[in-house]
């Protein structure tokens, strides 16, 4: 099968790796130097119609769209208009991620558990409401912000500052919601709009510094599987995944692709923190190396509305991801730092997230630069292998968290 992967980050490198392991011919646009070792890179303008034309011209059997911005731009719709199966939600269905105010209203309409909230389209109304709240206050930019549009404000003044920043943008909306307590977990469902298969639960570590301190990032590391009881998993399936898929069908915008539910396991049960419309990043770098079955075939089947969940199989054991971020990230990441990356092993691999080539050298080009994945029979083994490989990488000033897995007693700190 010929597979076209769209994107250039660590998530897309993990998608390419999964498809290549299954023996497929893999193309990628725009890609990165790490992806180039496993796929043929295609230079192309990145607008939706041109990408769909590229898929036709290259004879792609299926297109897998990585980043959310491409989904919001309608790449899947354009591919389908040309008769090319594409794995991902339509532009309309991707609103589940792209418009947090709409997404919250959708959850209310369909009885999907989430935090109490209010949405605002003017700064004055948002400020008035924030002044009545007791910290911590959760403030969200309603638009796409690459996982960095959330502020957990520990004072009303901090919430007001976050709101003022959001409303510097034309047409902005903000969501203010109650702060939830509990363990956070990522649940990803591969779905054809009705049938679905869950990946192993995983847990991201979203702040830049250890102990869940510092500014929010796109994610600094993952432990997988994260321990979720069978009773809670059944509630997640019934009250969140199945209600969401049924609700999208009922509203005439069936959701195909990867439904990512970011959840809080609260004392009152699992609740949705947010939905994403694609593989998480860095969750993809954790769950896809555990996939034993054929991702490209699952993507094609889902795009055709014919997914067989029983065919989606993951290996036993565990994975761990450690992100190496540039100095200055997330505010002002330094770019152009020379990288020296050792060879992968069967149980540890480096996925390129923000790299490029300059004057014959591999250098950093983004905030999150590398994702190092370790595999093992246990979470401890996986973490040990991820850190061992990360410590062999030459990357001056790299930021990484040494406490991945600490919430479940791993990573050198108690939960």
From Swiss-Prot:
Domain of life: Bacteria
Molecular function in Gene Ontology: ATP binding; metal ion binding; phosphoribosylamine-glycine ligase activity
Any GO BP annotation: purine nucleobase biosynthetic process
Residues annotated for ATP binding in this entry: 130-186
CC cofactor note: Binds 1 Mg(2+) or Mn(2+) ion per subunit.
Residue ranges occupied by any ATP-grasp domain in the UniProt entry: 104-304
Cross-referenced InterPro entries: ATP-grasp, ATP_grasp_subdomain_1, PreATP-grasp_dom_sf, PRibGlycinamid_synth_ATP-grasp, PRibGlycinamide_synth, PRibGlycinamide_synth_C-dom, PRibGlycinamide_synth_C_sf, PRibGlycinamide_synth_CS
Obligatory cofactor(s): Mg(2+); Mn(2+)
Binding residues for Mg(2+): 274, 276
EC number of the protein: 6.3.4.13
Family indicated by similarity: Belongs to the GARS family.
The protein, known as: Phosphoribosylamine--glycine ligase
Gene name per UniProt: purD
